[in-house]
Structure formats: structure tokens, C-alpha cells
A protein has these predicted regions:
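N-terminal hydrophobic or amphipathic segments with adjacent small-residue motifs
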Residues: 25, 75-77, 198
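Conserved class I S-adenosyl-L-methionine
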Residues: 71-81
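Alpha-helical subdomain
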Residues: 80-241
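Conserved Class I S-adenosyl-L-methionine-dependent methyltransferase catalytic core
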Residues: 1-73
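Short alpha-helix boundary/capping motifs
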Residues: 3-5, 10, 52, 77, ...
Length: 241
């Protein structure tokens, strides 16, 4: 129950997911019935969802914290979920400071997690819609983990532009998602995930590798690096300002 890999919350949330799958035919016919990108989740549903997301994120967060240097960095974590990534990095690097931004019902849980880990002096979560009210401070790193597949292309374009603008010179963007190959029928996990996004988000889209690289280049990012061997079916992209 108390394991950091505990999946019980996600199992509870799966009931909500299955209710959406039962009407998948309507989504295919473009009669969209789905969550408005998770904005209408109750706090309990959000908490269950984040428990599962936290269990899935732990190996990736530990990988990133051990692989990359964050000494004295100020980090922005967008759509931070349970806060697993920023909390893990902050526990590894005692000089890290950072901010999480997320939906109101999620931000409350993030601040509870920050307090539980005794990190209130260095971390905070702020409730905001990143498509409307983007932070203005400057950051050494921006985390964008499991977010882009929740947004249509025009939102991702704006989001990447905003991230580029708040990054310090040579600042880094860390981005993960489940990407498709150009044929859009592989790899298998990403195809299955694309169907889940169709059933469970209003505007979600699973991008191809070439699509996300083009979006990054169009927002003026450079040194784009693709990393496939993270402990997840997801792919990690790192890009510099």
C-alpha cells in the first residue's frame, strides 16, 4: 500500500476510463463526449489518477535525477501530476528550487505532496491554465512530462513558444510522451495509447517523432536529443534554448 510503485489508485481510475471506452464508437464518429483534457475530473478522480501516474513516473524520475546535472537550477514543471519528477530531482539536488503548475484540483494535491516531503522551502505548486496564464519567471530547466499528447497542435505550438521564452540561455526542455512512427501504426504501445487519448480527452493527439521534432525546431529549440532507453515505453526528448 505504501510502496512508491503502488498502482491501486490507477486501478480505481481505470473504471472511469472504461466508461469512456464503452462509448468509443461515438468518439470515432466525432461525437465527442470525453473529458475536457481532464479539467472536469473530481478531486478524488484526480487523486486516483495521480497515484497511478506517480508509480509509473518513479523509474523515469530517478533516471533523470541520476543522469543529468541540476545543481543550483530553478525548474518549472508543467502539468506536474503528482509532482514526482520535480520532487525526486529536488531530493537528489538540495540546491534545486522550482514551481509546478497544474489544474486547481491537482495543484492542491501537489502542495500536499511537497509538504509531506518537507520541500516547502524550495518548491511550490500554483494553480493555472498554462494555455492562458503562463509563468513569466526565467528557468534553467522546464519539465514537460506526459503533457503534449493532451493538447492539439496549435496549443503545443504556443506552449513550446512560451517555454522557449522563459528558459534562460542554454536552458533545457525535458519532454516525454508516447510517440508514433511515421506509419502511425507502430509501435504497438503508442497506437494503443492513441486510442486511449481518443476515448479520454477532448483534443488529445499522439504525435509522431518527426512531428514533435518539427514543433521543437519551429519554436527555435536546438540540440534536440532523442532518448529511447528510459525505463518506460515513452521517449524522452531534451532540447536547448
Amino acid at each position: 500500500k505504501d510502496s512508491k510503485f503502488n498502482q491501486t489508485g490507477y486501478i480505481d481510475f481505470a473504471q472511469t476510463v472504461m466508461e469512456k471506452y464503452n462509448n468509443l464508437e461515438n468518439a470515432i464518429k466525432d461525437n465527442n463526449f470525453s473529458f475536457n483534457n481532464f479539467k472536469d475530473l473530481t478531486e478524488k478522480q484526480a487523486e486516483n489518477f495521480m497515484k497511478g501516474m506517480q508509480a509509473n513516473a518513479v523509474p523515469q524520475a530517478e533516471y533523470i535525477a541520476s543522469k543529468y546535472n541540476f545543481e543550483n537550477h530553478n525548474i518549472l514543471d508543467i502539468g506536474a501530476g503528482a509532482g514526482t519528477y520535480l520532487i525526486t530531482v529536488s531530493k537528489e539536488y538540495k540546491t534545486v528550487r522550482g514551481k509546478m503548475i497544474d489544474l486547481p484540483q491537482v495543484s492542491k494535491i501537489q502542495n500536499r505532496n511537497i509538504e509531506r516531503e518537507h520541500l516547502k522551502d524550495r518548491l511550490v505548486s500554483v494553480s493555472c491554465d498554462y494555455n492562458i496564464d503562463f509563468p513569466k519567471e526565467n528557468y534553467d530547466d522546464v519539465f514537460l512530462f506526459a503533457v503534449v499528447h493532451q493538447e492539439p497542435k496549435e496549443n503545443v505550438e504556443k506552449l513550446l513558444d512560451n517555454i522557449y521564452n522563459v528558459l534562460k540561455p542554454n536552458g533545457r526542455l525535458f519532454l516525454t510522451s508516447f510517440f508514433l512512427n511515421d506509419d502511425k501504426i507502430s509501435p504497438e504501445f503508442s497506437v494503443q495509447f492513441a486510442i486511449e487519448m481518443l476515448a479520454n480527452s477532448k483534443n488529445g493527439k499522439v504525435y509522431t517523432h518527426n512531428e514533435i521534432k518539427k514543433l521543437l525546431k519551429d519554436s527555435n529549440f536546438s540540440n534536440i536529443e532523442r532518448i529511447d532507453d528510459i525505463p518506460s515505453p515513452a521517449t524522452l526528448y531534451i532540447a536547448n534554448k
